[in-house]
């Protein structure tokens, strides 16, 4: 598509009735799975200002491609590939280094759908394995194979408001993506996420979340705690734009960041 045709294409597509269908920008996973024999694509860019402990690296840019496929009605397969750029202080000769990060391969199984009249939430379970495809010399990868298992609970509080909670454990490896996340080689890492998202129309969702991680020895200043405010806007029934602003505490979290992405069904 020619560059000058893109704005016209997006405008025309936005004239159609659209409904939001996207997880990003939120890190809190949902209990839904991709419909059987269909693909779901997500791509986003997150630019973060790092904690002072990461110096001389000052900022990190992470471009992530995620592709999901509905194998059955309740089973989804996924692959996640990040491209990471680390921006250094001026005291470092190489101003920036970049390359592929560690790739993730996962599956999600929906155990229970939410039902009208029931107080029980929807439940799903997710397993991810992360391959050490990123360069450890450039600090783009952990050099470890990660195994992560977590559960999802999702409940509609009203017709327009949905709460989601995730909780899990990394049995091996660590939670780092580039210089963000817990970088440990031994012991377990416990993770937790919670989000509240409200639908203001068929096109617009707004929400907030908090997510974090801590090692098995519970040293908080080496942990991760991040909050995010995000939005999802459906251009069409297939294309959703996403935006988020986030900030965090402790060494494993970014000080501040901004997210911009889209999803396609």
Protein language model regions, located:
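Bacterial N-terminal signal peptides that target proteins for export
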Residues: 1-9
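Gram-negative bacterial Sec-dependent N-terminal signal peptides
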Residues: 10-14
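Transmembrane beta-barrel domains of Gram-negative outer membranes and organellar outer membranes
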Residues: 21-265
């Amino acid at each position: 598509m020619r560059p000058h045709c893109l704005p016209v294409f997006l405008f025309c597509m936005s004239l159609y009735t659209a409904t939001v269908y996207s997880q990003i920008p939120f890190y809190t996973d949902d209990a839904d799975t991709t419909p059987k024999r269909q693909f779901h694509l997500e791509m986003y860019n997150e630019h973060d200002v790092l904690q002072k402990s990461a110096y001389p690296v000052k900022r990190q840019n992470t471009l992530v491609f995620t592709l999901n496929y509905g194998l059955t009605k309740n089973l989804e397969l996924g692959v996640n590939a990040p491209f990471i750029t680390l921006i250094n202080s001026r005291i470092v000769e190489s101003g920036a280094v970049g390359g592929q990060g560690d790739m993730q391969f996962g599956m999600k199984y929906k155990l229970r759908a939410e039902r009208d009249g029931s107080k029980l939430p929807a439940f799903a379970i997710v397993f991810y394995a992360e391959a050490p495809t990123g360069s450890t010399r450039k600090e783009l990868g952990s050099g470890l194979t990660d195994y992560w298992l977590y559960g999802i609970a999702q409940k509609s509080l009203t017709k327009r408001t949905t709460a989601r909670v995730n909780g899990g454990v990394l049995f091996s490896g660590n939670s780092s993506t580039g210089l963000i996340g817990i970088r440990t080689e031994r012991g377990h890492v416990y993770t937790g996420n919670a989000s509240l998202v409200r639908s203001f129309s068929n096109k617009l969702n707004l929400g907030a979340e908090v997510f974090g991680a801590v090692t098995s020895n519970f040293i908080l200043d080496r942990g991760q705690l991040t909050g995010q405010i995000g939005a999802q806007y459906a251009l069409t029934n297939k294309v959703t734009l996403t935006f988020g602003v986030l900030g965090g505490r402790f060494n494993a979290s970014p000080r501040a960041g901004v997210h911009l992405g889209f999803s396609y069904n």
